[in-house]
Amino acid sequence: MKQLFATTSRGFEELLKVELTDLGAQECRVVQGGVHFIANDETQYRILLWSRLSSRILLPLITTKIYSDLDLYSAIVGQNWLTHFDERVTFLVDFNGTNREIRHTQFGAMRVKDGIVDYFERHGKTRPNVDKEYPDIRIHAYLNQDELVVSLDLSGEALHLRGYREDTGKAPLRETLAAAIVLRSSWEKGTPLVDPMCGSGTLLIEAAQMEAQIAPQLHRLHWGFDFWKGHNQVVWEKVKQEAVELAEQAFNRKLTPHFWGFDLDHRVLKKAQKNAQNAGVSHLIKWQQGDVAGLKNPTEQEIGTVICNPPYGERLGTTPALIALYSVFGRQLKTEFADWNVSIFSGEPALLDCLRLRAYRQFKAKNGPLDCVQKNYHIAVRKQVESAVENSQEKTLTFVSENTQVAQDFANRLRKNIKKIDKWANQQKLDAYRLYDADLPEYNLAVDRYADHIIVQEYAAPKNVDENKARQRLLDAVSAILLVTGIETNKLILKVRQKQKGTSQYEKLANKGEYFYVHEYGAKLWVNLTDYLDTGLFLDHRLTRKMLGEMAVGKDFLNLFAYTGSATVHAALGLAKSTTTVDMSNTYLNWAEQNLLLNDIEGKQHKLIQADCLQWLNKCDRQFDLIFVDPPTFSNSKRMEDSWDVQRDHIKLMANLKRILRTNGTIVFSNNKRGFKMDIDGLQELELSAVEISAKTLPLDFERNKQIHNCWIIRHQS
């Protein structure tokens, strides 16, 4: 009997213990990362051949305390390596762990290697060679604080490498992880198993091999024990022959195919088919291209299990399409798989909430570095009500759920808004406008339409609102938006908006570089919905830009703090004599230039200037008839000499603007500070007059948000 150790992924130790016991292991003891056990030769080989959960099977040779690299070297060079392999074989050292003295795994591996080759030299043998690619012998060293365990790796290559997977889709599951998911899924052999997003087919292939009694390592050609002197070839051949006969018997029973794999990508399905063929289970699995939104139960009145590892993102805010995917998936499960079991493995528990199902059991696990969860559900039998709705001779089946519609109040409000605002926008020839702006306090978000795209901007929840509850409401709202608008999931963008500090509104979020243009009162304006927090177009200033276009005829126009120059476009299309566009950001100034070119606006009379707007204004000696200034509420950018506060500094700004404003000129001044108070007395001292026009510049889609901006007409006193 030998003392052995089976390694596995964290979270699967107890499951592995059950498997090892079933395979004949004795005295199994669970520790983090694996199971200690004892076994005779026959059981040892059976575990190597049949374990679906083990990553490696290790034979410990040295267990000792080490406090320095000399201790490490001494422990290795003192081991009798010739009892395990001779000098003609190649070897490789895998070293894991550190302590105070051995602080790098590469150094640890080198010292183990030195000890082994020096041992052979001391015994009059040639130094065995190291082979990093295909070693005959693999030595596994593990250091935990001061305790060292050095083992012979009987597996060779890791046991998750079954040999059937030639190619994969994105983010494939390790075979050992897939087997664990299947074993925890509540699926029973002989019953249907459906994977609606099967990818390269690993879950189904692992399950099918269990059904077909195919040992996972049956076709492995090279083992870590091939050149080990303790290898018992006779016992090994016996165990392997038993496995071959079991697989043949199962094949001769002509098992009925009851595994189904669906995927939207036909190229990935071809890989899955090839993998299944290599694994010897292609006759058991049916593959079909299909979208989750149209998922149908492929069986006839049978009860089975749906198993799935859907895609998931590490950041929920970048994956609105996944919210839609899980929502639609949950709906199809309830519609098509009544009385079935469902097991879903995901790295984002919040996405599983979108299924709108209640798990009766869940497990934690790791998928590489990601913390994941597997949840098991049972789909309740739903009442099916057949309503004879005659519509083009079609009969509609209406399914009545015990659950109420997700975010029903929000969905109803959104429908109402769309009906009103879409009609108005079509009349105004607009295709970028707001559909919803925190109308209901519990759904604190904005929904904007940009042509055939939808942006959902979540306002940061107050500190007293439970984070999980806020996240669930967001998921519910996104599901409702997809249902109400019918938009394609890849055209919905989700952003989290918070109070901006300094120039953070200009910070880049992504680098997709996807631009398209929208129409606004005859102007065409480029927008980018993904790369920045803002899109390049402030929708609430739409009427202000229109007004500027109407006022600009024959005038010299200045756009200060110009952003992407959309106001300049309107002024130029309004036949301004000249335009000057000033902004500190080169990115946005280039954007402004592209906006002008998009509208065929060219010429020396249209100037674009990159500069600190306040510093440029101090030096400007040119006069203007019409000035639009929409400064930030606050800024402390390193590129500005001084900080800026619109409430504190607006009179100083007006004093500078007065200097360059012609006698009959007009300043259109706007900002987004809530509760802004114009210093009327300060303006009078400057001999300027101000009229607030905020209400006149609020378009229909922003009429509920009276404080989104304030706007003023400022002129010289007559």
From Swiss-Prot:
The UniProt record lists the THUMP domain at 43-154
As one GO molecular function, the record gives: rRNA (guanine-N7-)-methyltransferase activity
Q: Which keywords does the record carry? A: Cytoplasm, Methyltransferase, RNA-binding, rRNA processing, S-adenosyl-L-methionine, Transferase
Q: Which residues form the signal peptide?
A: none
Q: Name one GO cellular component term.
A: cytoplasm
Highest taxon, organism lineage: Bacteria
Record SMART domains: THUMP
Chief subcellular location equals cytoplasm
Spell out the subcellular localization from the entry.
Cytoplasm
What are its E.C. numbers?
2.1.1.173, 2.1.1.264
InterPro entries per the UniProt record, alphabetical = 23SrRNA_methyltr_KL, DNA_methylase_N6_adenine_CS, RlmKL-like_Mtase, RlmKL-like_Mtase_CS, RlmL_1st, SAM-dep_methyl-trfase, SAM-dependent_MTases_sf, THUMP_dom
Catalytic activity as recorded in UniProt: guanosine(2445) in 23S rRNA + S-adenosyl-L-methionine = N(2)-methylguanosine(2445) in 23S rRNA + S-adenosyl-L-homocysteine + H(+); guanosine(2069) in 23S rRNA + S-adenosyl-L-methionine = N(2)-methylguanosine(2069) in 23S rRNA + S-adenosyl-L-homocysteine + H(+)
Q: Which HAMAP family match?
A: 23SrRNA_methyltr_KL
The record's comment on protein family reads: Belongs to the methyltransferase superfamily. RlmKL family.
Question: Per its database record, what is this protein's job?
Answer: Specifically methylates the guanine in position 2445 (m2G2445) and the guanine in position 2069 (m7G2069) of 23S rRNA.
Q: State the name under which the record lists this protein.
A: Ribosomal RNA large subunit methyltransferase K/L
Q: Which organism is it from?
A: Histophilus somni (strain 129Pt) (Haemophilus somnus)
